[in-house]
From Swiss-Prot:
It is found in: Cell outer membrane. Specific receptor for the siderophore ferric pyoverdine (pseudobactin) 358. It holds the Pfam family TonB_dep_Rec_b-barrel. This is Ferric-pyoverdine 358 receptor. InterPro entries: Plug_dom, Plug_dom_sf, Secretin/TonB_short_N, TonB-dep_rcpt-like, TonB-dep_rcpt_b-brl, TonB_box_CS, TonB_rcpt_b-brl_sf, TonB_rcpt_CS. Residues 1-47 form the signal peptide. GO terms for molecular function: siderophore uptake transmembrane transporter activity; signaling receptor activity. A motif (TonB C-terminal box) lies at residues 802-819. It is a multi-pass membrane protein. Residues 166-276 form the TBDR plug domain. Keywords: Cell outer membrane, Ion transport, Iron, Iron transport, Membrane, Receptor, Signal, TonB box, Transmembrane, Transmembrane beta strand, Transport. It comes from Pseudomonas putida.
Length: 819
């Protein structure tokens, strides 16, 4: 136990009192006072710069390393830093910027007095000191947590390798959408966030069924706080793309193959969603918004200590949203609840338990028929919808999460995370029939409307455990991580139908009789069970001060059970088991300067798939290789990140639609396996603070996927995308005003209909948006967002025989009060 100190003393006096009154060696041992002393005092230490290399580790070891490498005297108390972990520090820095980076996000503050630095924990900043709470991070020292930083980038990310590396140190393309950017752009759902990311595109098959693509493949792996979940793109039970993002701190997107950490999956991307965590100091806000089409939203977020000593902390978030839309008879209703408790079980152990529940209820359905039976494209009003007024589609998603972080000796760390997800879907709609490569709409408007009833239950369990830390070899410090993760996914999906109704689509006014229980026709049952587990090991070898090599491998076991049958018939189950599948990973990073690096990486691809052939049998696993090389820059002490990447993906057994319906499948489209498929592309991105007060996020992406004969695959997706968004806080007497705006551009996309020797093309288009925020006082701010200011009409996504219009010009006003 540390000796209590008079609370009236300032941090420097407190530290010096400890130093002088507890000078005997045995007393220092008994008290556990952390004291790092230099052998000589150096004057003007604040102005001096050093080339530093301090990996992320326990705060005690990081401060000792800083004292040694800068020849500086550091004073601190173990009870202030117990259980805390530093950020990584690398490059050339002065003492002040070094402290800001190491201490960011910890609630610690520092005071420099000549060659002596005192580090303490405190509830409030005082004269001559800088407060670095978990939600008030000085922009010169960013860390993982983005909330409260005002930044469009982050200093540390672990999604790609599970190691705490900067974006520049990671040999893959990483995009981070921070809390500030989500607030500035008024991004409310996961699909809104992802479609604002360069290289990410969308198709929509009707209703609330989003397919999100990256590098030519659908994204089907989503992580929540690093625990992997699976999204089935066949049954379209896709809760991950519909999630409200109000409870998240940031969203990290690692593009390309990530099999080392996630196991089976496409070489598209992994989306890691990081929830907000409790803060050591009280903070809260309430927020209300109104907007176009009767948009109303209210939310509250409260966080802080639950005990006097702050060792137990909690956070609660709630949101309610109701809105109509630009489409007739189509409304949305969201309810979000999130609670989490975090505790310092010991000075080196942190445990966390949280629950979040989201309900998403929709009346009606978006989308319009995109082509007539004669092959002529349609041109409906954006207000047109294709569902009866009584149609609905309801999702309820509940997540239970647990986390444990244990600091070990010699700067090693053990982490354990577990999650359970439960999803219920209930849908009853009357929809315009959609089938790939076929239209059911005559030129005179006559067509059939079919009632569809879907019930689905999805359960997922996930565990992720890692042990990591530094080790010495050949005079250099290296990082090693070993781990295990497990995923169990079950999805039971039943689809029934009602009698077809003949209507005229031009004047049906979205009204048809709702089928009674005695009119329901049994349809199909579709069950999937997917279990995978794997052990992985990876190491970051610092071969020289400038050359870093990451080598890793994963050994995985898979079991995939699949059954599709018409109700009343006997199921025909299919099972695939793979054991000991090895996925290698290699990445190399060379530091050109303290701010710029070049890199190259390689990994294997393995993905069991539920795309089926004409007999209903799943295709063999997709296999391949992923190559990437690029350049990265980290400027202005990490406040600005830039990257350029070139990539190539080679795959066999890639599923391609045959446009044929599998017999007795309820409309399931058959696929064929394509060998020799190749995807090539480039990603360019810039994010962060370009100048004081000026935040920018921009990026360009090009991708093209071809089969072995050079034929382009997925032409319904744009090959090129450009995203730009920026905000500027005005200086001087206008400092209360922040202005922002941006533009999204997608290149041409084409949906082909071979049956009619026809196609539907969406030409390239721009969508422009603006925002303005005025800070009324220190606590209250008002924000105006205007989207699609030029009211561009365009298809945001095309699939099957449906098109989905992007929203017309719209506006929201949000009022936020921070306590």
């Amino acid at each position: 136990m540390s000796k209590p100190l008079p609370s009236a003393l300032n941090p420097l006096a407190k530290a010096l009192l400890i130093r002088h009154s507890l000078r005997p060696r045995h007393a220092l041992s008994r008290i556990g006072m952390g004291l790092a002393l230099s052998s000589a005092l150096v004057f003007q230490v604040q102005a001096q710069e050093w080339t530093l290399d301090i990996p992320a580790q326990s705060m005690n070891s990081a401060l000792q390393a800083l004292a040694k490498q800068t020849d500086t005297q550091l004073l601190y108390s173990p009870e202030d830093i117990g259980g805390l972990r530093s950020s990584a520090l690398k490059g050339r820095h002065d003492l002040q910027s070094s402290l800001r980076i190491l201490l960011q996000g910890t609630g610690l503050r520092y005071q420099i007095d000549g060659n002596t630095v005192t580090v303490t924990a405190s509830a409030a900043a005082k004269d001559g000191q800088i407060e670095l709470s978990a939600t008030n991070v000085n922009s010169a020292g960013l860390g993982e947590t983005t909330e409260g930083t005002g930044s469009y980038t982050t200093r540390v990310t672990s999604t790609a390798t599970k190691m705490n590396l900067s974006i520049r140190e990671t040999p893959q393309t990483i995009t981070v959408v921070t809390r500030q950017r989500m607030d500035d752009q008024h991004l409310g759902s996961m699909n809104e966030v992802l479609t604002q990311t360069p290289g990410i595109t969308m198709s929509q098959d009707g209703g609330e069924r989003f397919n999100i693509y990256s590098r030519g493949s659908a994204i089907n792996i989503y992580q929540f706080d690093g625990v992997t979940t699976y999204q089935d793109n066949q049954t379209r039970n896709m809760p991950s793309t519909l999630m409200d993002v109000g409870l998240y701190d940031r969203i990290e997107i690692v593009r390309g193959a990530t099999g080392l950490m996630t196991g089976a999956g496409d070489p598209s991307a992994v989306v890691n969603v990081i929830r907000k965590r409790p803060t050591r100091e009280f903070k809260s806000h309430i927020q209300a918004g109104v907007g176009s089409w009767d948009y109303y939203r209210a939310e509250a977020d409260v966080s802080g200590p639950l005990t006097d000593d702050g060792r137990v902390r909690g956070r609660f978030f709630a949101a309610k949203q109701d809105n109509h839309t630009f489409m007739d008879w189509y409304t949305q209703d969201r309810d979000v609840l999130y609670g989490v408790v975090e505790a310092d079980v010991t000075d080196t152990t942190v445990a966390r338990f949280g629950i979040d529940r989201q309900t998403y209820k929709v009346n009606g359905a978006p989308g319009v028929p995109i082509i007539y039976t004669n092959g002529q494209p349609t041109n409906f009003s954006r207000s047109t919808s294709s569902d009866a007024r009584w149609g609905y589609d309801d999702y309820t998603t509940t997540n239970y999460t647990f986390g444990l972080e244990q600091q070990l000796a010699h700067d090693w760390q053990f982490k354990l995370a577990a999650a359970y997800m439960d999803v219920d879907r209930d849908s009853f709609s009357s929809y315009y029939s959609t089938t790939t490569n076929r239209s059911y709409l005559e030129l005179d408007g006559s067509t059939e409307i079919s009632a569809g009833i879907v019930t689905a239950k999805q359960h997922q369990k996930g565990v992720d455990a890692t042990l990591q830390g530094p080790f010495q070899l050949l005079g250099q410090t290296h990082e090693l991580i070993v781990g295990y993760n497990y995923l169990e996914y079950e999805n039971k999906h039943r689809g029934d139908s009602g009698p077809d109704v003949n209507i005229n689509f031009y004047d049906w006014d979205n009204q048809t009789p709702k089928p009674g229980d005695d009119e329901i026709i049994p349809g199909i049952q579709y069950n999937i069970s997917n279990r995978q587990s794997g052990y992985f090991v990876a190491s970051r070898f610092n071969l020289t001060d400038d050359l870093h090599l990451i080598l890793g491998a994963r050994a995985s076991n898979y079991r995939f059970d699949y059954a599709l049958w018409r109700i009343g018939n006997e199921p025909a189950p299919y099972k695939m088991v793979e054991r000991g599948v090895v996925t290698p990973y290699a990445g190399i990073v060379y530091d050109l300067t303290n701010e710029q690096s070049v890199y190259a990486s390689y990994t294997d691809i393995f993905k069991p798939q539920n795309n089926v052939d004409i007999t209903g049998k799943p295709l063999d696993p997709e296999v391949g290789k992923n190559y990437e090389l690029g350049w990265k820059g980290e400027f202005l002490e990490g406040r600005l990140n830039a990257n350029i990447a070139l990539y190539m993906v080679k795959r066999d057994n890639l599923a391609e639609s045959t446009n044929e319906v599998v017999p007795d499948s309820g409309g399931l489209i058959a696929s064929r396996a394509v060998d020799g498929a190749e995807t090539k592309g480039v990603d360019v991105e810039l994010s962060g603070e370009v100048l004081p007060g000026w935040n920018v996020f921009t990026g360009y992406s090009h991708t093209r996927t071809e089969d072995a004969d050079g034929k382009r695959l997925t032409p319904q997706l744009p090959m090129d995308t450009f995203r730009f968004w920026n905000t500027y806080r005005l200086p001087g007497e206008w400092e209360k005003l922040t202005l922002g705006g941006g533009v999204n551009w997608n290149s041409k996309s084409t949906l082909n209909f071979a049956r009619y020797n026809s196609h539907v093309t969406q030409d390239d288009y721009f969508v422009t948006s603006l925002m303005a925020r005025y800070r009324i006082n220190e606590s209250l701010a008002a924000t105006l967002n205007v989207n699609n200011i030029f009211d561009k009409k365009y298809y945001a996504g095309m699939a099957g025989s449906y098109g989905h219009y992007g929203a017309p010009r719209n506006a929201t006003v949000t009022l936020r009060y921070d306590f």
